[in-house]
A protein has these predicted regions:
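Bacterial N-terminal signal peptides that target proteins for export
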Residues: 1-10
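Sec/Tat signal peptide C-region and signal peptidase I cleavage site
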Residues: 20-25
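Short, surface-exposed binding/anchoring microloops in extracellular/periplasmic proteins
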Residues: 26-61
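Residue-level recognition of well-ordered beta-strand positions that form the cores
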Residues: 34, 46-48, 64, 93, ...
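A short, structured loop/turn motif at beta-sheet edges
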Residues: 37-41, 65-71, 96-102
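The feature marks short-to-medium sequence segments in extracytoplasmic or secretory-pathway proteins
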Residues: 58-83
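Short, solvent-exposed, Trp/other aromatic-anchored flexible loops in extracytoplasmic proteins
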Residues: 74-103, 107-114
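Short beta-strand elements
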Residues: 118-128
Length: 128
């Protein structure tokens, strides 16, 4: 009787844990941004994101370049989970940034929490 109760308790805990694993991955954090000016107003971005992807049900699914007014200038879609690659870096080339923008923010998004992780601000002054 005791063994049966212990087995049921272990099974219940395992089921609850597997259903809630997506919560434990946390929010997606931008940990590094490298910007390379290619020509007047055109840049290449390499962005490193840290997130505890657990699979298709919870993963970092994109990062975005946002101006100071909250307008999304460009989006880099992440097409699959990075379960065995943490942190990971992905690039986006040929990003056109209007000349009047001197500072922007790079933020990451995940499929459960959406936004809320660490962002990185980038100063573009002197890069033109």
């Amino acid at each position: 009787m005791v063994n049966a109760m212990v087995r049921k308790s272990v099974l219940l805990v395992a089921c609850l844990a597997s259903q809630n694993m997506t919560v434990f991955a946390g929010e997606a954090d931008v940990v590094k941004v490298a910007v390379d000016a290619k020509s007047q107003g055109v840049y290449n971005f390499s962005v490193t994101v840290s997130h505890g992807d657990t699979g298709w049900e919870h993963y970092a699914d994109r990062w975005e370049i946002v101006d100071n007014d909250g307008n999304i200038l460009q989006t880099r879609v992440l097409h699959h989970p990075h379960v065995n690659e943490r942190p990971f870096t992905r690039s986006l080339a040929g990003v056109e940034i209007p000349d009047h923008i001197e500072r922007l923010t790079v933020r990451a998004h995940d499929s459960v929490h959406e936004y809320g992780g660490t962002v990185v601000s980038v100063d573009l002054q002197g890069r033109h």
